[in-house]
UniProtKB/Swiss-Prot annotation:
Keywords: Membrane, Transmembrane, Transmembrane helix
CC per GO annotation: membrane
Places the protein is found: Membrane
Transmembrane segments: 2-22, 39-59, 90-110, 130-150, 187-207, 242-262, 270-290
Protein name per the record: Serpentine receptor class delta-19
Family the entry assigns: Belongs to the nematode receptor-like protein srd family.
Membrane topology type: Multi-pass membrane protein
Upper taxonomic lineage: Eukaryota, Metazoa, Ecdysozoa, Nematoda, Chromadorea
Length: 339
């Protein structure tokens, strides 16, 4: 069984790393002027998801929750087991902070789309400051959560009591855990990972409905190209909003395991195996919907070894940025600052 999940992590993590690196490159060098400010958020998404995929590949976590108790056991089966337990612990802490930052970033993206319907586009510096402000809670989580992990010598005797039916002594991965989830640092981390997801998700869909209502009410005042361009980016964001449901599933699996509702090694492996799908699939939305990105991807598929050819070329046109099915949607710069 462990072989299957190792292949799963390697496959999805490597795919996610490649797609997010590609998206970062395209957002920096191929973003049209019309979405230059928004490209800041795209780069934020891509960088966060790349780090998350790389860390998932590095640690490959099995989460064994102690049913009915505030305790967790972690088993790391990734390459980090060859670099020391500390690297596994810090790796998990930063992976979890990427998950939370991705959720906040999604909220920023939808909020910005709603904002620019009534206001001029924000500068890239302003968007960067907003992103950093939302990033601080996740950074605090990353810098503190790893300090809670106890060494193998301390967790193994306890884990054998909690799970006598597991042969944990022969476990080849790094064995560690958190023996007190009531600690303030642990409460902060678990709450920050699990609680914001569903309120943020509800807010995202409320914003989506407001944007759709506004576009419908302003349809006679907007040009067809402008409205179509907004609609296409909204579709990209909506698709991207569906993808984090994988994180929601992972959270529900964790609660099921922690509460004792479900108990299975497959469940323990599946929590992080499901979560990796979010950062691995997320970049596809922009690679498909943003026309210059999509055109570049097609050229890469035809000539896979020419990704970095002519990097000095930058997308300068404000037209044809978003795709509608197989046809480009043309718009001019006011699409970013619709009043």
């Amino acid at each position: 069984m462990i072989i299957f999940f190792e292949i799963w992590h390697w496959s999805w993590a490597l795919l996610g790393c490649y797609l997010n690196l590609l998206l970062t490159y395209l957002a920096i060098f191929r973003s049209p002027k019309a979405i230059k400010s928004y490209a800041t958020l795209i780069i934020n998404f891509a960088a966060t998801d790349f780090v998350e995929c790389a860390l998932d590949l590095f640690i490959q976590t099995r989460l064994v929750a102690v049913p009915g108790e505030a305790k967790l056991v972690y088993i790391f089966n990734g390459p980090c087991k060859y670099t020391g337990s500390l690297s596994c612990k810090v790796g998990l802490s930063f992976l979890l902070h990427c998950l939370t930052h991705s959720v906040w970033s999604l909220l920023i993206s939808f909020g910005y789309r709603f904002y620019i319907l009534h206001n001029p586009a924000l500068s890239r510096l302003t968007l960067l400051k907003i992103t950093i402000m939302f990033y601080i809670p996740s950074l605090v989580q990353a810098l503190t959560y790893w300090t809670l992990f106890v060494p193998r010598e301390k967790i193994l005797p306890l884990a054998k009591q909690w799970f006598p039916y597991y042969d944990l002594e022969t476990e080849t991965g790094v064995l560690t855990g958190v023996i007190d989830l009531t600690n303030f640092v642990a409460v902060y981390a678990v709450a920050h990972i699990c609680l914001p997801f569903f309120p943020v998700y509800i807010t995202i869909f409320v914003l989506r409905q407001k944007i759709m209502k506004y576009l419908g009410g302003q349809s006679q005042m907007m040009s067809q190209d402008t409205k179509a361009a907004h609609t296409q980016l909204l579709r990209a964001l909506t698709t991207q909003a569906i993808i984090p449901m994988f994180l929601g599933i992972a959270v529900l699996l964790y609660f099921s395991s922690q509460s004792g509702l479900l108990k299975s090694p497959i469940l323990e492996y599946s929590i992080f195996s499901v979560a990796i799908l979010m950062p691995a699939l997320s970049p596809i939305t922009y690679l498909y919907f943003v026309r210059p990105y999509r055109q570049k991807v097609k050229r890469i598929i035809r000539h896979p070894f020419k990704l970095l050819s002519r990097p000095h070329e930058r997308a300068t046109s404000n037209s044809g940025v978003f795709y509608s099915g197989d046809h480009p949607t043309h718009f001019s710069k006011p699409v970013i600052a619709v009043h």
